[in-house]
Amino acid sequence: MKNLVEELKWRGLYHDSMPGTEEQLLKEVTSAYIGFDPTADSLHIGSMVQIILLVHLKNFGHQPIALVGGATGMIGDPSGKSDERNLLNEETLAKNVAGIKSVLSRFLDFNSKEQNAPIMVNNYDWMKEFSFIDFAREVGKRITVNYMMAKDSVKKRINGEGEGMSFTEFTYQLIQGYDFYHLYKNNNCLLQMGGSDQWGNITTGTELVRRMGGENAKAFALTTPLITKADGSKFGKSEGGNVWLDADKTSVYKFYQFWVNATDADAEKYIKIFTFLDKETIDALIAEHQTAPHLRILQKKLAEEITIFVHSKEELEKAIQASNILFGNSTADDLKKLDEKTFLEVFDGVPQAEIAKADLENGLDIVTVLNEKTGFFKSNGEARRALTANSISVNREKIKEDFVLTANDLINNQFVLLQSGKKNYFVIRVV
């Protein structure tokens, strides 16, 4: 079999693994799982590393298992958290589980008939009938409190300045550990993967498999590094918060812009992690980018590849069209194709003013619009000089002083875009 660990290492997707993991993956088709807890009804780009890891696993001939944590989500993972998580109610959890299943289904074909077809499971299905007494006897008996207390996620909470850790969160690693044993027993799953912050929980699982599975039981672990930006700040957030994988939470335009705006150092790192381009292609792109960094070749290729992967080629083309509007490489037709949400996002931060729709019934002369109605220009004289200089556009089309603004000029029946020169924009919202 091809060497998956070697592939992960050059891409920057490998952090650590248990002894024997690489040999197991080279020896035979191996089932491996990653857990996704339903803390929200979608996933953001912070989860992309784990999704991509499952896709690489599949591409290298192994079987990926995506576990949605309907049970573990009821408790909350304490790893990397300084405070107790708020418990989610069942209705919210059910909605979140459905949302995450929907997202994962875009990247892995769970209906495939292949031998190594991806599987999706929900740990609530096997935990819901487990009584506390049975769990304490069958699982709790196998792992000592000393072992659990030695985990970093536990030590940091207990030795920190907060309120410590509840018994509920303390048991999280046992439930996650039992997930591994359940998948080992029922799906012949030998490997659990996750972010490096999950090492403690994952190794509890490998320990449980060995102690519950008998003397021939084997279990392996592999983790990915936590992704940070070159400046050390947290990856996955923009100024507006999380960058989501659902277009109704983060538009395709904003998703595309997030990657296009990456620094050179970040783009060089991200293109290895977040795309499936081969090493030769990536090395050539990096070399080409370094000859003309101002063209942002690397960032554009990164944004294109991951936008197609997460959304589609069609959505990528729309995002590129929307991006071109701000930089002058667009037409009036391109502007009219924008939906309301994308229009407002493209021109976020641009000065705006409202005009009553009734004012447009008989038409408004452009000088009145530019000065009195919007304040885009300070005086009629200044507006006329700009018009005479042929520097005013309405919806990307140059106009003269005799232009009259009417309802026929509205974009989405609501907006008008004014432009003076190359970079001065003004949006009229008609109400």
UniProtKB/Swiss-Prot annotation:
SUPFAM superfamilies recorded: Alpha-L RNA-binding motif (SSF55174), Nucleotidylyl transferase (SSF52374)
An MF annotation (GO) of this entry: ATP binding
GO CC annotation: cytosol
Motif 'HIGH' region: where in chain: 38-47
CDD domains reported in the protein's UniProt record: TyrRS_core
EC top class named in words: ligase
Compartments it resides in: Cytoplasm
Binding site for ATP: K237
Residue numbers binding L-tyrosine: Y33, Y172, Q176
Protein's UniProt keywords contain Aminoacyl-tRNA synthetase: yes
One annotated GO biological process: tyrosyl-tRNA aminoacylation
E.C. designation(s): 6.1.1.1
Record keywords, A-Z: Aminoacyl-tRNA synthetase, ATP-binding, Cytoplasm, Ligase, Nucleotide-binding, Protein biosynthesis, RNA-binding
Domain S4 RNA-binding, chain residue ranges per copy: 364-431
Catalysed reaction equations from the record: tRNA(Tyr) + L-tyrosine + ATP = L-tyrosyl-tRNA(Tyr) + AMP + diphosphate + H(+)
Pfam families associated with the record: SYY_C-terminal (PF22421), tRNA-synt_1b (PF00579)
Motif ('KMSKS' region): 234-238
Subunit structure comment from the entry: Homodimer.
Primary role: Catalyzes the attachment of tyrosine to tRNA(Tyr) in a two-step reaction: tyrosine is first activated by ATP to form Tyr-AMP and then transferred to the acceptor end of tRNA(Tyr).
HAMAP family to which the protein is assigned, alphabetical: Tyr_tRNA_synth_type1
Similarity annotation: Belongs to the class-I aminoacyl-tRNA synthetase family. TyrS type 1 subfamily.
Protein's name according to its UniProt entry: Tyrosine--tRNA ligase
